[in-house]
Amino acid sequence: LLRYLKKIFYNSVAELRINKYKVIFLDIIWEKQYTMKICIITCHDVYNFGASLQAYALQHYLEELGHEVEIIDYRPGYLYKKYDWKSFTSKKFDKLNSFFVTRWMFRIAKWSYLRFSLGRKKCFDEFTKNYLKLTDKTYYTFEELKMNPPCADIIIAGSDQIWNPLFPNGKDPSYYIDFALSQTKRVSYAASFSVEYISDADKEFVKGMLAKMNRISVREYQGVDILKSLDIKNGVKVLDPVFLLDRNYWETFMHKGSEKDYILIYDFEGSDLMKRVALYFKRKKGWKIYSINDALPRLYADKNFTKVGPQDFLSLIYNCSMFLSNSFHGTAFAVYFNKPFYVFGLKGISLNSRMESLLRSVDLKDRFITENIDIEKLHLNYDFNKVNLLIEEEKNYSKQFLDSVLKTN
């Protein structure tokens, strides 16, 4: 009723400019009834394109619905100290850290690597400052969150690999919203386990954490299977937040690029197969090879991009003629922008469930290639009409999930 009345009065103001005070009165009621304080907890600032863009996408989508949204500025040491050249983040280096000489040898080696990333780090810091709305308070431990939790109507965990049991964040109660006040609704959106199963040793912890959640959605089909193995029947699969925003929005959001006719490489592991596929299509089509790198360049690439931020990342994918990667979000945007692409598996088969689930969602499972592939049989013939329809169906379902969460608060 309020939505209907508000629409009527807004139309009256636009056409007749009357009923001013009634509109203001209804606005007050509307804000009280429908505007909520929402906090998001995710790995938002780890100098990763996908992590930054998915955090922004969920924040912006919820803001467009009229809500007050903040990302909890949670910076646990296991995530953020690895960008500190003086810090040891792996227990296997504990013994080295106890000796002065080896400690400084490690620091020098780490600094030598990190200095190549400083330009990229600056781009990410600017993106975070300009686009991510963080809580005023920064939290460094779960205990700090528990002692002084942010006040919100709803706290949303996700998206991305926040529940990956192979990483420390997958065993951190913070990412299961275990710190929230009793009256705060706890919801996950497109959270990812990033694996096909979790070990028996982790099941009790994960099940106990998820039992406190009000609503659960995950990003992968395998995530739903994991939930079922934990006796959690009400979990659903939704799309990554980057799909919540329209293609047109991303086109205006990205930095403008003018380069054309290139194969874009985004490779985490130095894949020899990716290199061979890139060189094959370079010979076949006459395209150049561009590579996005964390630090060290790909020597076979015609051009390496090391000082790029999330908006440049989008532009490079949007303007490429072909995309090759083992990145989930790189693949997601290639699909969304209707770019010819191939996906390469990461070492450790369980880590590939993210890409496999995405490709299954859009009926492009044949784009995941392995070592035994015949490169000469690879092609660039794509019919994205069906893909786009499938994306719209899943997007609508994902939005309905969020709508149901917000309406039942």
Regions from the PLM with identified roles:
Residues 30-409:
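Active-site anion-handling motifs in enzyme catalytic cores
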Residues 5, 19-35:
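Short, Lys/Arg-enriched N-terminal segments with co-localized hydrophobic residues
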Residues 10-11, 20:
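Short, intrinsically disordered, low-complexity terminal segments
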Residues 2-10:
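Extreme N-terminal basic, low-complexity initiation segments
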